[in-house]
């Protein structure tokens, strides 16, 4: 495919709302973090809207939490993520902010009028709860595993864009550990979330970076890639990606427990096995 923007993307370029002395402030409030996390924290503090695309296991959640409360000390904050990581978000928030109030929105409706602090909801519940969520003035929005939004035509994507556009949230983080730059079209919805200039028109983006062309039936094909090095430059101020190979300060191995709810019929099958 030619070049790739899947390496270390990010830098000092301001891409919307530079906060003063971001690096120095990041070092001051993050003494217990690994150096790459301090760098990521500084990156998030240096812009109001950004994409953090580190490999899984490099601590995107904690970087986002710290950056969010530093940029906007008063909540509430809304985290949209897959259902399987909602519990992990609560744990990470309480590690960083032991006194934080957290609310998980689950299948049983939660009284949205009482939302404060950190509210965690999964993508699948957005359709049910979006009207209630739009009643709040969120200090920050986090879209975790943001590759769930890679199809800009889905209802999930449209609801997410409504939250960004209609709540007036001053800080937006898009987090993903999945490299999207092998197929640039998957990046477009994330660029919309963070209000990047390249997120204004999909067809213009596709013609420039997706090798867009019409097939024999007159339909646009946008699954290719083109001008990748140029795209890398364009992303430099809005997206930061580090792979584990780039990061030299990690311990050899870390393990963590993740609680999951197992349906009763599955428990019975396991017990009978």
Question: What do these predicted ranges mean?
Answer:
Residues 48-67:
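Walker A/P-loop
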């Amino acid at each position: 495919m030619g070049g790739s923007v899947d390496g270390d993307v990010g830098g000092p370029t301001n891409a919307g709302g530079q906060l003063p002395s971001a690096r120095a402030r990041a070092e001051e409030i993050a003494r217990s973090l690994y150096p790459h996390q301090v760098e990521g924290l500084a990156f998030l503090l240096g812009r109001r809207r950004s994409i953090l695309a580190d490999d899984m296991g490099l601590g995107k959640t904690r970087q986002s939490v710290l950056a969010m409360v530093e940029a906007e000390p008063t909540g509430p904050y809304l985290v949209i993520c897959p259902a399987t990581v909602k519990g992990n978000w609560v744990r990470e928030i309480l590690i960083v902010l032991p006194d934080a109030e957290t609310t998980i929105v689950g299948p049983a409706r939660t009284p949205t009028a009482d939302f404060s602090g950190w509210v965690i909801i999964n993508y699948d519940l957005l359709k049910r709860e979006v009207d209630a969520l739009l009643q709040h003035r969120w200090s920050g929005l986090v879209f975790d595993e943001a590759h769930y939004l890679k199809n800009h035509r889905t209802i999930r994507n449209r609801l997410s864009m409504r939250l960004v556009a209609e709540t007036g949230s001053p800080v937006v983080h898009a987090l993903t550990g999945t490299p999207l730059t092998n197929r640039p079209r998957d990046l477009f919805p994330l660029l919309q979330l963070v209000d990047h200039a390249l997120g204004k028109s999909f067809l213009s983006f596709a013609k420039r970076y997706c090798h867009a062309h019409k097939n024999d039936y007159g339909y646009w094909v946008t699954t290719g890639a083109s001008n990748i090095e140029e795209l890398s430059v364009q992303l430099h101020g809005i997206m930061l990606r580090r792979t584990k190979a780039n990061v030299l300060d990690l311990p050899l191995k870390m393990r963590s427990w993740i609680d999951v709810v197992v349906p009763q019929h599955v428990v019975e099958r396991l017990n009978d096995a």
